[in-house]
């Protein structure tokens, strides 16, 4: 709400545009389309890209997980609007939550590509110490029947822990399930 009112990002973009300085924006918000008049000319010069994070296509789950963020369909509309304006868009499937959202990986990539995304990435759920308990509480409230399965799958993909800080593994995980997720991602991207 404060960005909508104060336009801080827009004022920064105005300065960057005036000086032909490159910018990459990562967002879950549809508000980024407000600044098309700045981003499109910058993109035409190769100076602007936008990454839009899509966690799930399930509107109900999205509301429970990210109550203040744009709904999945709105994010896909945002990708379409940005792409139509000539802005290179990356879809970021993030976070991928084993046994909760991982089955949607291909569908998200396909829908985002259809909307105009030209790049894609994914990030396996990361639970640093300060988030581990919070996520556990969220699961107890919203998915109590799946809590242990989700946490166990995450541990399998993180070498027995819920979080791994090691560079190269913290975003993707390790082990057979993590390799399978990466292969599914690569195969879907190749087919698009």
Tell me the role of every PLM-derived stretch.
Residues 1-51, 55-63, 72-79, 84:
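Conserved Radical SAM active-site core
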Residues 4-7, 66-74, 100, 104, ...:
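Alpha-helix N-cap and loop-to-helix initiation/capping positions
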Residues 23, 48-52, 89-93, 120-122:
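Hydrophobic faces of well-ordered beta-strands that scaffold small-molecule active sites
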Residues 26-33, 97-106:
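Active-site glycine- and acidic-residue-rich loops that bind
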Residues 36, 62-64, 102-103, 132-134:
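Short, well-ordered secondary-structure micro-motifs
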Residues 57-59, 65-68, 81-101, 124-127, ...:
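Conserved strand-turn element in the central/C-terminal portion of the radical SAM core barrel
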Residues 103-192:
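Auxiliary Fe-S-binding modules of radical SAM enzymes
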């Amino acid at each position: 709400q404060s960005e909508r009112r104060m336009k801080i990002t827009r004022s920064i973009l105005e300065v960057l545009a005036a000086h032909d300085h490159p910018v990459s924006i990562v967002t879950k918000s549809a508000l980024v389309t407000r600044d098309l008049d700045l981003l499109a000319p910058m993109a035409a010069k190769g100076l602007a890209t936008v990454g839009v994070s899509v966690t799930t296509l399930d509107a109900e789950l999205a509301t429970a997980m990210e109550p203040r963020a744009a709904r999945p369909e709105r994010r896909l509309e945002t990708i379409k609007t940005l792409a139509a304006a000539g802005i290179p868009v990356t879809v970021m499937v993030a976070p991928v939550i084993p046994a909760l959202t991982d089955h949607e990986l291909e569908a998200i990539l396909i829908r985002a590509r259809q909307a105009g995304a030209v790049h894609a990435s994914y990030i396996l759920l990361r639970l640093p110490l300060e988030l581990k308990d919070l996520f556990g509480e969220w699961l107890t409230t919203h998915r109590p029947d799946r809590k242990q399965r989700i946490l166990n799958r995450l541990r399998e993909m993180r070498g027995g822990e819920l979080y791994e800080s090691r560079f190269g593994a913290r975003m993707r995980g390790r082990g057979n399930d993590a390799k399978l997720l990466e292969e599914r991602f690569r195969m879907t991207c190749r087919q698009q």
